[in-house]
A protein has these predicted regions:
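Membrane-interface alpha helices of multi-pass inner-membrane proteins
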Residues: 394, 408-423, 433-435, 458-462
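Lumenal/periplasmic acceptor-binding loop at the mouth of the active site in multi-pass
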Residues: 257, 262-266, 273, 495-611
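Transmembrane-helix signature of polytopic, membrane-embedded enzymes
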Residues: 335-370, 386, 403, 620-629
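Perimembrane helix-loop-helix junctions
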Residues: 429-460, 468
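Start-transfer (signal-anchor) and selected internal transmembrane alpha helices
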Residues: 1-22, 36-99, 113-179, 183, ...
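Extracytoplasmic catalytic/substrate-binding loops of multi-pass membrane glycan-assembly enzymes
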Residues: 249-280, 290-308, 314-318, 474-480
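Membrane-interface transmembrane helices that cradle and orient dolichyl/undecaprenyl
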Residues: 284, 383-408, 437
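Transmembrane-helix motifs of polytopic, lipid-linked glycan transferases
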Residues: 319-350, 390, 607-614
Length: 869
């Protein structure tokens, strides 16, 4: 049944009349000057004329049938007379009007006031162009209600699942609004995640649809997809290369984990947790297993990864970071494969482009959002994201057809085992994966037991070399329990228990000596000695724990959802994050309040996410929900660790825009199916042929054994890393270090008397060591406001040269007051330091940079050679 021309045009112009009236009311409701400016009155007149003209055309369309038929026949061709150019031109007009109408006023400079006056009419024009597109769609497809019913019937499972998921989203929204779960600040509480800009989403969709439109070669044409493995290999490599180039060419900015650049080398050296991980990697480079010296290697696989990066790129931190970016840029390529398998190549491309854009925002916005983790930081969150994407891919390949030999189960177990040595949170995924597999296998419980057993076996194979090393060094294989006990239990759980004795000190992510205490937010950490969280009330002991776990878990979900655009305005990253001041979603004290625009957009985005989830359930059942379920499990693991938001959600927040993109492409596919002329035989349910057909490549045992061998060799590289390098620091005693200075004629150049040196050597508070210096930073607190935000334990009164020094038994922070920055101080230089030990650092009295031409630096002013100072 087609819509008749009078009804079609009458509806079109009637809706245009209502839209013009709404824009006119909005303009008149806004405050203006007393006399109403000429420009304002001109726009009022323009909207009034537009409204009256639309109303007149509405009446004309309904009252004069012949005129309506003549207009539709001339300007809106249908059937075989339809040509795509009108649709393309109107689509371009709509995009241009949207770009103009939603342009922020600050981008227009002195013309901003005139633009603000004209904006209501531009909004009307944008809506009118969108209506025209819909009219072209309606007349092209013919709008047969039987087709709509058939589509609903064929997509019944997907639509029902989508509505169920959307209902759960809305229920969660209601619970958050009533209980304030996810909005009540806690100790390790980061801001909302790194946002995607709406122009980036539109660009990603355009790339995806352009790829879908390249049907001339048959690779992307709906319903005619071919396996095209080589095509996928090419696309995979192109995405990898584009991501590596884009991220490496995005300028790095000052951030908490990579502050700077500071003289003398003007590099973004790592700090806080990133510094700990890199210093852990420096010990194997001098042939020392740090664990044998009493250190706890917090992230063993990631630190070992840095060992080999340094072995290839040297100690130039820029080269190391660039090489890391090249490797981690595989992440969007993995999302492409996952999207292609779950749905289609356009979904994979959309997810990959969004991933590239999001990390560009993270790199550029590190100063704006502060506690982020990016591929350009020596942090463990983004490598975990790569591991989680690969894990989701393998689990889907495993569970989409449980009749296969479990080669993918073995590979997935190995990946999860390796992930546990990057961060501890993935341990929580183990029971969730086993449970997902149980649902996937159904009544085939013997197959489930066998596959789960192989999964767990390869997991053990992956971690076995490091467990063996820990038994030899620390007497226990459970390398993760030390971090859980000290970092999580003592610093995060005990303070929440009303009757517990709270340990002194601040939470720290490392047990290494000299490690800096770094709360997750820039603001002061709230006092939680007797109150689990602000607003927790008189909760019982277990109630307090339940509250902060649920609170952080909810905050993780909220922060992840809000990475999608919440405004139609084409703001830049700075204005998105900081444009609304204290009302910004990224403000430290954001109370959960959303604007009407944000609510509408968020509801639309949640609907698309629900459609993506619903489609995956209808097509793949539990296997299609693997990314979603692992995301929820990881978010809950963060809640159990009492961490949330910001950098903590980086490993899994990609799942949000992944399902969002899947739902968006699926809607576009449905719309594209309606563009087929009446009578051409639409196949609404087969417009997508997922590139995951079962058939060849059922998986063989040799593939599983190969996966086991690979993960074992990766795991073995951890304890072996320190055996590939020799220890240059064979002298560890104070007298031995002074002997080196004397032999090189440097002892006399220090300017201290012999008896003073002898007395200083016997002083128990003295520090005389031969080691390697890293990350030299000259901090001038008068000229650099950000300098005060790092090294909180150092005095902030005078400029300092600060660097880290590792020796075979420990690493220390060296502080040397200096009037000006040294001209020469290379990173990873061998040095001899004389100083006085304090609680958190060494107060330097002399620093000697060794080499062919040794350089001596003394404090300004020069101090007596005695301790304490």
């Amino acid at each position: 049944m087609k819509i008749k021309p009078p009804a079609l045009l009458g509806s079109f112009f009637g809706l245009a009349t209502v839209e013009a009236l709404g824009c006119l009311v909005y303009l008149l409701a806004n405050p203006a000057d007393q006399n109403n400016s000429v420009s304002r009155m001109a726009v009022v007149a323009l909207l009034l004329v537009t409204m009256l003209l639309s109303a007149w055309l509405t009446g004309l369309s309904i009252g004069r049938r012949g005129w309506a038929e003549q207009i539709t026949g001339r300007f809106i061709p249908t059937g075989t007379a339809w040509r795509p150019w009108a649709w393309i031109i109107m689509a371009a007009v709509f995009i241009i009007l949207w770009l103009v109408a939603c342009l922020p006023a600050y981008r227009l400079g002195s013309y901003a006031l005139y633009f603000a006056r004209l904006q209501p009419w531009l909004v009307w024009a944008m809506l009118a162009s969108l209506q025209t597109l819909l009219v072209f769609l309606v007349t092209r497809s013919g709008i047969a209600w039987t087709d709509w019913k058939r589509m609903v019937q064929e997509e019944k499972t997907a639509l029902f699942a989508s509505l169920s998921v959307l209902a759960l989203f809305l229920l969660f929204w209601l619970v958050v609004g009533v209980s304030r779960l996810g909005l009540t600040r806690d100790v390790f509480w980061d801001r909302t995640g790194v946002p995607l800009l709406n122009l980036q989403v539109v660009t990603a969709l355009a790339v995806s649809l352009l790829a879908a439109g390249l049907g001339a070669v048959g690779a992307f044409r709906a319903g005619k997809l071919r396996p095209g493995k080589w095509l996928d290999v090419v696309i995979f490599l192109v995405i990898w290369a584009v991501a590596a180039i884009a991220w490496n060419f995005t300028p790095q900015t000052h951030s908490h984990f990579a502050p700077g650049p500071y003289p003398p080398n003007y590099e973004y050296y790592p700090y806080s947790d990133a510094m700990n991980y890199d210093l852990d990697a420096q010990y194997p480079l001098i042939g020392i297993d740090a664990g044998s010296k009493g250190h706890v290697i917090d992230k063993p696989l990631y630190s070992t990864f840095l060992v080999y990066l340094h072995a290839i790129a040297g100690e130039d931190i820029t080269s190391v970071v660039s090489l890391q970016v090249v490797i981690l840029a595989v992440f969007p390529a993995l999302l492409y494969l996952l999207g292609k398998l779950l749905h289609s190549r356009p979904v994979g491309l959309l997810a990959a482009v969004l991933a590239i854009f999001k990390e560009i925002n993270a790199i550029r916005g590190s100063l704006i959002i502060w506690t982020v983790s990016t591929p350009k930081m020596l942090m463990s969150e983004f490598p975990t994201a790569v591991g989680l994407a690969l894990l989701c891919l393998l689990i889907f390949l495993w569970l989409r057809d449980t009749r296969r030999k479990p080669v993918y189960a073995m590979a997935a177990g190995g990946v999860l085992g390796l992930m546990t040595m990057v961060r501890n949170n993935p341990w929580f995924l183990l029971p969730v994966i086993i449970l997902i597999a149980w649902f996937a296998y159904g009544r085939q419980w013997k197959r489930w037991l066998a596959a789960s057993g192989l999964f767990f076996l390869v997991l053990l194979v992956a971690i076995a070399p490091w467990e063996w090393r820990n038994i030899r060094v620390r007497g226990t294989p459970f390398y993760f329990l030390i971090t859980l006990e000290h970092t999580v239990w003592e610093n995060r759980y005990l303070p929440a228990l009303p009757t517990a004795v709270v340990p002194t000190g601040h939470p720290s992510g490392s047990n290494l000596p000299g490690a800096q205490s770094t709360p997750a937010v820039r603001s002061s950490t709230p006092n939680v000695t007797n109150h689990p969280v602000s607003g927790g009330g008189s909760l019982s002991r277990y109630g307090a724990v339940f509250f902060f776990v649920a609170n952080n878990f909810s905050h993780n979900l909220i922060a992840s959802a809000l990475t999608l655009p919440t405004s139609l305005l084409e703001n830049d990253l700075d204005h998105v994050v900081n444009g609304q001041g204290s009302a910004s979603l990224w403000a430290t004290g954001w109370n959960g309040r959303l604007s009407l625009e944000a609510i509408v957009l968020l509801l639309f985005e949640l609907l698309l996410i629900a459609l993506g989830v619903g489609y995956c359930w209808s097509r793949w059942k539990i296997a299609g929900l693997a990314p979603l379920l692992l995301n929820l499990a990881y978010m809950l693991a963060l809640g159990l660790a009492r961490t949330s938001g910001g950098r903590y959600i980086v490993p899994s927040d990609w799942v949000t825009y992944f399902y969002f993109g899947l739902g968006l492409v699926q809607v576009c596919r449905w719309v594209a199916s309606l563009r087929e002329p009446v009578g051409t035989g639409r196949q609404l349910n087969s417009v997508i042929q997922p590139a995951g057909e079962t058939g060849r490549g059922q998986g063989r045992w040799r593939g599983g054994l190969a996966a086991m061998l690979v993960v074992f060799l990766v795991g073995l590289s951890l304890p072996l890393s320190s055996t590939f390098f020799s220890n240059p620091f064979l002298v560890e005693t104070k007298s031995g270090v002074l002997q080196i200075l004397a032999e090189d004629g440097l002892l006399d150049k220090l300017g201290y008397a012999t008896q003073d040196i002898e007395s200083f050597t016997s002083n128990p508070g003295s520090f005389i060591a031969y080691g390697r210096a890293f990350f030299p930073r000259y901090l001038d607190y008068k000229t650099d406001a950000y300098a005060k935000e790092i090294y909180n334990d150092l005095p902030k009164t005078t400029p300092h040269l600060v660097f880290e020094m590792i020796v075979p038994t420990a690493w220390n922070t060296i502080d040397l007051p200096m009037v000006s920055s040294p001209a020469y101080f290379p990173n990873a230089a061998d040095v001899i330091v004389l100083g006085c030990k304090s609680a958190h650092y060494v107060d330097g009295l002399a620093v000697v940079i060794l080499g062919q031409h040794p350089v001596i630096y003394l404090p300004s002013p020069k101090k007596l050679l005695s301790c304490p100072l």
